[in-house]
Structure formats: C-alpha cells, structure tokens
Amino acid sequence: MAQSGSGHMTRREALELIGMSAATASMFPTQAFAQGPTFPKGAVIRTLFKDYAPEELAGGATLFHEHMSLAPDFMDRFRAATAAVRAAQGLPPAAARAGGPPNPAPGADPMRDVTLMTQELAKAKNQGVACIVDAGHPDMGRDLNFVREAAMKSGVPVVACAGFYSQPYYPKEISTMSEEQITQALIKQVDDAPAGAFGEIGSWDEITSDERKVFRAIGKAHVATSLPIFTHTGIPGKSAIEQLDLLEDAGVKPEHVAIGHLGNLVDPNVYVHKTICRRGAFIGFDRQGGNGDAQQVPMVMALIEAGFADHLLFSADAFNDYAKTLTVFLPKLKAAGANEDVLHRITVDNPRRFLAFVPKRPRRRTS
C-alpha cells in the first residue's frame, strides 16, 4: 500500500490495512489517533503470521485476553478446581463469573468449529476490533492449528501465547522440573508458535510452590525474549500483589506486566488496583459484557478519575461475541461519564503499548 508523502501511515491507510470501515472506526476519534503513543525503535506486536509495527494496529481496539481454543473439559476442570480451593478456605461457592458468555448450546461451540470461529473473528473485526490475543497455551488444551486457520481465514491479526496456566492444569513433570528447565520449555513454546506474549499465567489465591516456580521461570523467559506477561488471578484476586512481586524479583519491569481479572477484586476504593498501577504495571478488567459490569464500571471510573487510565486493559475473556467490550461495556462507561479520548487510550493505545516489544530473538518462519 502506498503511504502518505510524509512517510507516515495515515489514519485512512491504517484502517484499510486492517480492513475496517470508516463507519466502524468512528468510535476512535481522529484527534486521539493522531496523538497516539510512541514506541521504542524496533518494537513489534508479534502475531501468528507477521510482526506488526504497533502503528499498524492503531485503527481499532486490541483485546488482550480472549480464547479461541481450549480443551473440551477445560471449564469442568476449572469449576472443580475453584470449588476445591474455596472449600479448603472455608468459603462458599463462587458466584457466576463476572463476564464472558454462557456455555454454548450443543453443536454451536465456536471453539470446535473453525467456520464458526472464523465468523466470530470477522464479526469482531467489523465491530471495531483490530487485533485479538488468544490467551491459551498447551496445558489449557489450545489447538494452535485451529487458531491459525481461523486467523488466516478471517484476516484478523491474532497474537498467540506461551506459558503454563496454573496448578490444576500443569503437566505432571512441572513438580520435578527446575526453574531453568521450565524457562527453556517456555522459550521453545515462544519459538514454535511463534508467541507474542506469555499468558495467561495463573495462580489461585493461595499461590502454590509450583506456581511460584513457574512465575519465576516466566520472569526468566521474559528476560530472554522481552515478551509481555499477563496473569490470571482467582476470585477475589488476593494473589495480585504477590504475582507482581514474583515477576519483579525475577527481573521483569512492571510496565511489561498486566495483572489480570481484577474486576473480580471488588473494592470501591480500588486500593490494590492503585497500588499495582503506581508500581507501573497494567491491570486487566477482562471479564466484560456480563453480569459483573455493574461492579466493574465504578471501579474503572475511580481509576480513571485518579489518573490511572494509562494502566487499564479491557477484554471479555470470551470465546464468542468478542467485541462485547466495545458494544456492551464501553457504552456503560460513557453513561458513567468516560469520554471518547480516554476510552480510545484504554482500548487502542494501552494494549499496543503493553504488547509491543523489541525482540531479542529472531522470529521463526511461520509454516
């Protein structure tokens, strides 16, 4: 595509590059686009099929935590693990999750039908999504070939991830592997995908010794690759600070970390949220468009009003209707007083700043 005479991509050219209509893009103001963030020289956002300059994805939202492929029994195992942890802590059963879709009807699961998944991605693109991060990895049952096919057919840039999820999902050998062995396994995942982030990297609210070991290895793998890291915290997110501590102790700068699922940590004063932001990390409100929006909106507004908008990341943690962050959650924030400029920063600029990294290792050719 020919670029403008200045050598910089125009707004219209960027929209055409990702196939987005001007009408859809009207939710992203031109002024905010023109005043977008700056990135380090050589920074890229690594998707399955190419490395993008961050500026190339400025024409729409990037969703930093979604799912396109998980094992068929993933949610059953998740519910069982959650129930066991809460029972051990003397807590009542967890309430319904704060966002994301209900279980699909039999025969209508996009994660089992590449045609349906391609349609979901194409719909999200038409609704203003420029890029999606698939937050799965091998121990979650992600089928990378499935993700590749849906990304290719839909034309949506998809970031694949590397990692180990949490104790109930770890391969048995994790308990006997050294941190260095886990680090090397993670780097191999990065090269093989190729991956553009480590995530989601999880723990339950009482972090196990194996989970601490994995977090330290993730930190070492980041130092070797520069890939950003996003995490999974349990309900209500008591492990958030310790997760950041573990990663920082391993040599990770906070600006390369997003502590996830903090919409579940309900606190009108957003004390933990502010603490993490002050340390320089991002925080994820990433289960949007569901029954938890009512608790998330006032917390997001409190953080915006406190000056922490540049530390917020939004997503739905969904496997369909990916654009619900834009179509359902953002209107609620607008009704609460958020303006277009700040919403552009959160949905377009922040995830690009988070995902952009300067590679330390060459990208392997995608087959």
Role assignments for model-derived ranges:
Residues 1-10:
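N-terminal secretory signal peptides
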Residues 10-28:
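N-terminal export leaders
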Residues 28-55, 367:
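C-terminal segment of N-terminal export signals and the immediately downstream linker at the start
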Residues 65, 132, 222, 283, ...:
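Divalent metal-coordination and catalytic microenvironments
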Residues 67-114, 161-180, 318-330:
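Active-site gating loops and adjacent loop-to-helix segments of metal-dependent hydrolytic enzymes
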Residues 130-131, 149-153, 157-228, 279-282, ...:
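Active-site gating/metal-coordination segments in enzymes
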Residues 145-148, 172-173, 208-213, 236-251, ...:
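Distinct, well-ordered alpha-helical segments
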Residues 232, 286-288, 309-323:
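Short acidic/histidine-rich active-site segments
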